[in-house]
A protein has these predicted regions:
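Short C-terminal tail/terminal secondary-structure segment
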Residues: 55, 134-135, 146-159
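Active-site helix of classical SDR
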Residues: 30, 67, 75
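Residue(s) in the substrate-gating loop at a strand-loop-helix junction
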Residues: 50
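Active-site loop-to-helix junction immediately N-terminal to the catalytic Tyr of the SDR YXXXK motif
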Residues: 10, 56-65, 77
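Substrate-binding pocket helix/loop in short-chain dehydrogenase/reductase
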Residues: 6-7, 11-16, 111, 115
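Alpha-helical segment proximal to the catalytic Tyr-Lys
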Residues: 35, 80-81, 143
């Protein structure tokens, strides 16, 4: 999924495929969840973004970074439009996480080692660390949080 192919060599079909999964998917999920949430008195929308959409695009993958940037702004707009409906919308921004996708993107040992030089904690994050953020945002502990950004990246965006 993550290639180092220059923008001018990309196809519209590649671009659209990534946008369909990452930004259109979030739009459709949100669009269809809002009426049910409103009818039940509120809810919490949690979008999984990426540090690539936070302004730290180390992927060199323009479609992916742009799609995650779209999710970032969409989450904020949703928050402002639906706060009065008691619907909260927040986004989580994972850094490199120990998943099949990250390992596939960095299949060369040098690539992973190089990426980790830009993570102060020096390791991949764990899925359970992202899950903890999701649980927090879904809980009443975050009841006054909407339009927020929870960055879970081992310090990568602080560099």
């Amino acid at each position: 999924m993550i290639n180092r192919v220059p923008i001018e060599q990309r196809t519209v079909e590649e671009w659209d495929r990534v946008q369909a999964v990452n930004s259109r998917g979030v739009f459709l999920g949100t669009k269809h969840a809002i009426p049910a949430m409103r009818d039940s008195g509120g809810g919490s929308i949690i979008n999984i973004c990426s540090v690539a959409g936070y302004g730290q695009s180390t992927t060199q993958e323009p479609a992916y970074a742009a799609s995650k940037g779209a999710v970032r702004i969409f989450s904020k707009v949703t928050a402002t439009q639906h706060a009065k409906d008691n619907i909260r919308s927040n986004a989580i921004f994972p850094g490199p996480i120990d998943t099949e996708m990250v390992h596939a993107a960095m299949s060369e040992p040098k690539a992973l080692a190089e990426r980790l030089t830009r993570v102060p904690m020096g390791r991949l994050g764990l899925v359970k660390e992202i899950v903890a953020g999701v649980i927090f945002l879904a809980s009443d502990e975050s009841s006054y949080m909407t339009g927020g950004e929870l960055v879970i990246d081992g310090g990568a965006t602080s560099m």
